[in-house]
Amino acid sequence: MKIYETENYEEMSRKAANILSAQVILKPDCVLGLATGSTPIGTYDKLVEWYEKGDLDFLEVKTVNLDEYRGLTRDNDQSYYYFMHEHLFDRVNIDPENTNVPNGTEPDADKECERYEKLIESMGGVDIQLLGLGHNGHIGFNEPDSAFAQTTHCVDLTESTIEANKRFFASADDVPRQAYTMGIGTIMRAKKILLIVNGEAKADIVAKAFFGPVTPEVPASILQLHNDVVIVGDKAALSKIPR
């Protein structure tokens, strides 16, 4: 496990974008595993900036996203499909046919999970998987006590997640109750994992996940057993790790 400490969010984003862009340059048809949320936005902005300067070419790049809400249409501005197009896909020259996000409107959840898992396998697996880190150590929608061997699956969202999401929707009834997520087993099969984290609020869980015991109670702790993990965090997020 390699840990890079940065001064701030901007520097963290630049470092993460450097690692992703190196993968694209070394293997133009690479498979990138991508994440959503506020943390990777700066990373995507950097990739777009370098694409606009002519330093990066996404024409052959393939992507698979970590998760998606079940029940949201792709034109819903809270869907992760929408997020990815807004922050990256529509801003670079990636082929839309090469971008993959779980289909939130597929009525058969088991069918969609099986399709997505087989899709990842058919692409030869993920070359580098970008991850954020939840306050309780979750990665994707793999909450505490998720099975480490689990593949892509549909999860019931926790009440705290549903409550936190209410502010993004017009009505509480519109808030998704389920989501598709790559399982921890799927994530662990990525050839390389890049986890980005920032802010003092994440300091405790960073120390617990990466310097505490490997346990399903802290899903991200399993990453200690992966043979190629890079953590990029700002000073605040890394302030409680052993020195």
Model-predicted regions and their roles:
Residues 2-115, 119-122:
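N-terminal active-site beta-alpha-beta segment that forms phosphate/nucleotide-binding
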Residues 4, 72-78, 82-86, 90-243:
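Conserved phosphate- and dinucleotide-binding cores of soluble alpha/beta proteins
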